[in-house]
Structure formats: structure tokens, C-alpha cells
Amino acid sequence: MVRLLDRRSGDWGGVDRERLTSSVLEPHRTGRASTFQRFDWSVRALGPAEPLPQTDVLIVDLIGLFHPDALPHLDVSIWCDVDLDTAARRGMARDRALGRRHDALWRDVWIPNERDFEERYAPEDAASVRYLA
């Protein structure tokens, strides 16, 4: 089941951490073949299954992985310290450049989710590495 990323969630539960952990993080860590699905914003659903790359390093960009349930599955976590207003402006500009009109989602869902998550879980403190921009 895919959880929608367009709803309020103080723990970023919509990112489907359980699926990401079981189908991506753990198989990669143990060297097992697996597949993953990208979220396709044009249809607002998971895309087709793709083979998980067999690499030494796998980078996943997702604040919701700083959740206590997911952190044990990460070898290294990096927090890029950018203020939320700047990050939101950049994200909205990126989305507009891609033809995605997500301003309302940013304003009404994603920014409040980020604030709630940061307050509740202090991801910058949980990070192995903190990058100050």
C-alpha cells in the first residue's frame, strides 16, 4: 500500500519507511538483489519496479529516514543544515521548473510536516554528519 505524501503527518509517515527499509535499505546492506519503486509525481503513485543498484554506497534523500524506526538501518546519516524557508523556496522553484505546481502542498503539508518532524525527532542531532551550508 502506498501512503500519500500529500497529507499532514508529524512523523512523515507518508514516506512509507517500512517499505523503503525492507525493499531497499536491508537488501542493499546485505548484498541481496531487490527492486525499488520511485514515486511518480505525474500520476501520484509508485512507478514500476526497478532493480536495486548493486553498489558499495547507496544515497537516499529523505528526511523521514531520520525516524527512530529507520535510523538503525542506516550506516551513515547526513543532515544538510539549511533553514526551512530557504529549502522550501528552492524546492518550490525546482518543482515549478519541472512543471509541477505544488506550492499548496509545500505550504499546507510539507513545510508543516518538516517543522513537526524536526521538533519531535531532532534529525540534525541524530545525524552522523552535519553539513552547515
Regions found by a protein language model. Give the residues of each.
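ATP-dependent NMP and nucleoside kinases share a basic, alpha-helical "lid"
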Residues: 45-95
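Small-molecule kinase domains that catalyze NTP-dependent phosphoryl transfer to phosphate-bearing small molecules
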Residues: 45, 67, 96-133
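Structural signal for conserved beta-strand scaffold positions within catalytic alpha/beta enzyme cores
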Residues: 3, 79, 131-132
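A generic structural signal for well-ordered coil/turn residues at beta-strand boundaries
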Residues: 35, 54, 74, 125-126
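Conserved nucleotide-sensing/catalytic segment adjacent to the nucleotide-binding pocket
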Residues: 1-58
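Generic structural signal for short, solvent-exposed loop/turn connectors between secondary structure elements
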Residues: 9-12, 64, 68-72, 132-133
